[in-house]
Amino acid sequence: MACCAPRCCSVRTGPATTICSSDKFCRCGVCLPSTCPHNISLLQPTCCDNSPVPCVYPDTYVPTCFLLNSSHPTPGLSGINLTTFIQPGCENVCEPRC
């Protein structure tokens, strides 16, 4: 029996400003946080169909000002969410379930 359900994705809960653009791949559609003029780290949540890895690990740092400033285009802006969440059944994806 598999330890985790396939395609199950999880990130730590908490307030965040989610900004994903089409030129950056955000696994499971999750980007965490911040606000301009700071940089954000695109964090990839754990997917249960992979071998056990840390819940969240940094991927790429990108400036976000151009996405938040209306005087600049927003290439591929896909959405802005205010909170993160954990899918049902994935609360402890970093713990072995076998």
UniProtKB/Swiss-Prot annotation:
Q: What GO molecular functions are on record for this protein?
A: structural molecule activity
Q: Where are the sequence repeats?
A: 3-7, 8-12, 47-51, 55-59
| N-acetylalanine modification, residue list | A2
Q: In the UniProt record, which is one GO cellular component term?
A: cytosol
Which tissues express it? Wool.
Annotated keywords: Acetylation, Keratin, Repeat
Q: Where is this region: 4 X 5 AA repeats of C-C-X(3)?
A: 3-59
Instruction: Kindly give the Pfam families that the UniProt entry links to this protein.
Output: Keratin_matx
Q: For this UniProt entry, which segments traverse the membrane?
A: none
Q: Whom does it interact with, and what assembly results?
A: Interacts with wool keratins.
User: What task does this protein carry out?
Assistant: In the wool cortex, wool keratin intermediate filaments are embedded in an interfilamentous matrix, consisting of hair keratin-associated proteins (KRTAP), which are essential for the formation of a rigid and resistant wool shaft through their extensive disulfide bond cross-linking with abundant cysteine residues of wool keratins. The matrix proteins include the high-sulfur and high-glycine-tyrosine keratins.
Family according to the record: Belongs to the KRTAP type 3 family.
Official protein name in the record = Keratin-associated protein 3-1
